[in-house]
Amino acid sequence: MERERSNFFFLFLFCSWVSMAQPTLSLSSDGQALLSLKRPSPSLFSSWDPQDQTPCSWYGITCSADNRVISVSIPDTFLNLSSIPDLSSLSSLQFLNLSSTNLSGPIPPSFGKLTHLRLLDLSSNSLSGPIPSELGRLSTLQFLILNANKLSGSIPSQISNLFALQVLCLQDNLLNGSIPSSFGSLVSLQQFRLGGNTNLGGPIPAQLGFLKNLTTLGFAASGLSGSIPSTFGNLVNLQTLALYDTEISGTIPPQLGLCSELRNLYLHMNKLTGSIPKELGKLQKITSLLLWGNSLSGVIPPEISNCSSLVVFDVSANDLTGDIPGDLGKLVWLEQLQLSDNMFTGQIPWELSNCSSLIALQLDKNKLSGSIPSQIGNLKSLQSFFLWENSISGTIPSSFGNCTDLVALDLSRNKLTGRIPEELFSLKRLSKLLLLGNSLSGGLPKSVAKCQSLVRLRVGENQLSGQIPKEIGELQNLVFLDLYMNHFSGGLPYEISNITVLELLDVHNNYITGDIPAQLGNLVNLEQLDLSRNSFTGNIPLSFGNLSYLNKLILNNNLLTGQIPKSIKNLQKLTLLDLSYNSLSGEIPQELGQVTSLTINLDLSYNTFTGNIPETFSDLTQLQSLDLSSNSLHGDIKVLGSLTSLASLNISCNNFSGPIPSTPFFKTISTTSYLQNTNLCHSLDGITCSSHTGQNNGVKSPKIVALTAVILASITIAILAAWLLILRNNHLYKTSQNSSSSPSTAEDFSYPWTFIPFQKLGITVNNIVTSLTDENVIGKGCSGIVYKAEIPNGDIVAVKKLWKTKDNNEEGESTIDSFAAEIQILGNIRHRNIVKLLGYCSNKSVKLLLYNYFPNGNLQQLLQGNRNLDWETRYKIAIGAAQGLAYLHHDCVPAILHRDVKCNNILLDSKYEAILADFGLAKLMMNSPNYHNAMSRVAGSYGYIAPEYGYTMNITEKSDVYSYGVVLLEILSGRSAVEPQIGDGLHIVEWVKKKMGTFEPALSVLDVKLQGLPDQIVQEMLQTLGIAMFCVNPSPVERPTMKEVVTLLMEVKCSPEEWGKTSQPLIKPSSS
């Protein structure tokens, strides 16, 4: 009995266990396969219960009547799978949608076993590797959507076996090769998109013209070349053809006129030539026709007016000629007509006023003549009208006052006459009124105050007269006020000071009199103030010290008196100060030397200043141009020797005395720079005047100068020869002393050292060598390892240990001497934007370079950190690096190539000034075995190497320019040259080009931390973006020099004439 009870108890436990285990064991194989999708994220999909018998009730899952999974649709979830699991057991699967699920790794070839699959959507992930050819087995597949991944390799030709395929989306990947011509067999295909694969090349197969079911064909932003196949005329169902930003050339095939369903034709930014086919006029349903940015010629065919549905017509930036067809006035749905930057002639057809839906009319940069038709006032929806740079004459029609939606009106650079119609100022939305460079006359009407929406009022270079109306001070939103080069008279109304948002005030070249209103000091946002070439009297207002954002102050050619106010020291953003041709007196204040931001120009000439040059001028190390001529200054000029960035100097017609500094700059400038300073003299050391030399207007005779130069050169050569001989003998002696010792290791520090400091250093070789430990490593690069070494006085220096160049036994005396000579050249370089080489020490095995230490790190660390780096700091770093590089290229003889310009080699001091490091070291390392196996390092670092190096193997100044352009793009975008998150792994140059080739605005390239800034700053950044793209031009010949780059960058903040231009920006965004 007891045994029976025991058996019953164990039977009960077994049955209980079976009943509990049964749900897990009964989950179907389909369910088991699906669970592998959530393995990295178990908390996902609470409804996916492994206790269920089937997954048919799970989220995103659909089953057939026999409980087989036929659909898996879980887009926009965070699966976070590093590889897609094997799902081939889902043999009934028809729909698989894993888009935007954070997948990576390759596409499994086993997907080719899912023979019932009708939809495969893996888009918007990080999938890599090739597209498996096995997908060509999916005979029932209708939708293959793999866009926005990192797929590489060529497009498998086996895809052409998918006869049921309707949608093929492969855009925005890294595919290469060409489009298989066999794709012409995909007769069911309706959408075919390949855009954004920049490495995809070759011609467009003519066979694609047989895919008569196509509605969308997109190959934009790729490397496709050749011509547009004429067979595309067979695509009678095509609605969108996007072939912009490619290498496509040739003519536009007239057969496209047969594509009767076409709505969008995007052929902009290509290399198309020839004329616009009149056959395009047959496209009755087309709404967007974008042909801008090609080399099209001929006229606009009048047949275009038959495109009755047209909304956007953009043929700007071509070579089109002839008249603008009046028949375009028939396009009643037209909203954007963009014909700018061509060679159109004739008059503006009045018929355009019939385009009642017109919002934007851009006719700028042509050769149009005649007057502006008064009927333009019929365009009640018009928001922008650009007509600048033509030859339009006559008056400005008062009918513009009827265009009540008008926001921007630019009629600059024409031949307009008459008055500015008061009706313009009744426009409640007008924010930009640009009338520069015409022959307008009369006064500026008081009614200007009615236009409260005005942000930019630019009427310079006309013949306007009378007083500037005080009512202008009521324009509370005005940012730019240009009244320069007119005939305005009377005083400058102090009411202008009420416009507290004003950033630019330019009234130069008028007849304005009286004192400069002290109230202008209330314009705390002012950045540029130009009152030059008027008849202002009195003192420079002390209140100008309040203008903390001012970067240009131009007051020359007036009747100003008194002294420079000491409050000038508060203008710490000032880059240009011109006070020349006035009657200013007294001493130049020491405070002026404290304005260390002065970089472009300081001009105090033709005044009556007395006293010495302030000692504080030694801090103006960024200043490029200084003019102190025609004053009554005296004393020595040794302080000018500290101005290491000077490119232009004039101190003539003063009473200076003593020696002329012996810096390289003073050795190269013309004697006219310091004429009529009878007590100036030349000097060998810059401290004392040379003996036995005559003085004539502060300049020695040419014979004496030549003789001095010869003597100096001879002494230098003799000293150098003696030094090299001693070095050679010491080396031979040390070598013989060590010849009997055991062979040294690769890092042997026991060899005798040679230590050459380039300035006084309180450090010994032992201090340096003992610091070369792993704990002190602060960086590794192409040229060597960098250590931090502490000097006994507490200072810190950076020590770079160069990679070994050759085997110790092979390194001869000539190699040592050559290295010493190269280092001597680098040690003589002095520039505020170049790291100073303090000295070097070497022995038979090791070479060490000593530099200043910069605790703020480098630009790469700054950009990739979490700091909100503002535009001013970025611009400061960009221009500092450019100035340093320009110095190496243009001011060093012979020129020095950097060879490795990158963010890691741009160090930052405590004030975030850019300091170039590692200049010229690549040349020293070219014999290194480390480089022998990676020669590309000699040309720079990955991501920064100029494209021509791949086929020329030559390095030039233009190679450095390309690398600098990449750095500039990194500064603007906040991204690295190559990183996974840049547009699917694209190089930053290609990423920017891709952005500019889509419908995204240029602003989308900029760092998100730079979004939402004032319009003027946005324009500065866009101009800088244009300069960067100029630098990374694929053709070295087309790139600027670094000196030109510096000038262009200076002009970003130097050109008030270009501020606020309402025309197309430097890089034109795609139209839409």
Curated annotation (Swiss-Prot):
Q: Where is this motif: Small peptide recognition?
A: 171-172, 193-196, 216-221, 244, 266-268, 314-317, 336-338, 384-388, 410-413, 432-436, 456-458
Q: What is its EC number?
A: 2.7.11.1
- Alphabetic keyword roster: ATP-binding, Disulfide bond, Glycoprotein, Kinase, Leucine-rich repeat, Membrane, Nucleotide-binding, Phosphoprotein, Receptor, Repeat, Serine/threonine-protein kinase, Signal, Transferase, Transmembrane, Transmembrane helix, Ubl conjugation
Active-site residues, as the UniProt record annotates them: 900
Entries under PROSITE patterns matching the protein: LRR, PROTEIN_KINASE_ATP, PROTEIN_KINASE_DOM, PROTEIN_KINASE_ST
Q: Which GO terms describe its molecular function?
A: ATP binding; peptide receptor activity; protein serine kinase activity; protein serine/threonine kinase activity
Upon gene disruption, the observed phenotype is:
Smaller root meristem size and fewer root meristematic cortex cells, associated with shorter roots and a slighty reduced sensitivity to RGF1. Quintuple mutants rgi1 rgi2 rgi3 rgi4 rgi5 display a consistent short primary root phenotype with a small size of meristem associated with a total insensitivity to RGF1 and undetectable levels of PLT1 and PLT2.
Q: Which residues form the LRR repeats?
A: 66-89, 90-113, 114-138, 140-162, 164-185, 187-211, 212-234, 235-259, 260-283, 285-307, 308-331, 332-355, 356-379, 381-402, 403-427, 429-451, 452-475, 477-499, 500-523, 524-546, 548-571, 572-595, 597-619, 620-642, 643-667
What is the disulfide pattern of this chain? 56-63
Location(s) in or outside the cell: Membrane
List residues of the Protein kinase domain.
772-1067
Catalyses: L-seryl-[protein] + ATP = O-phospho-L-seryl-[protein] + ADP + H(+); L-threonyl-[protein] + ATP = O-phospho-L-threonyl-[protein] + ADP + H(+)
Q: How is it modified after translation?
A: Phosphorylated and ubiquitinated upon interaction with RGF1, thus leading to activation a subsequent degradation. Autophosphorylated.
Q: What is the annotated signal peptide range for this record? A: 1-21
At which residues is Phosphoserine found?
Answer: 936
- Name the protein family: Belongs to the protein kinase superfamily. Ser/Thr protein kinase family.
Its protein name is LRR receptor-like serine/threonine-protein kinase RGI5
- The organism's lineage? Eukaryota, Viridiplantae, Streptophyta, Embryophyta, Tracheophyta
The gene it comes from is RGI5
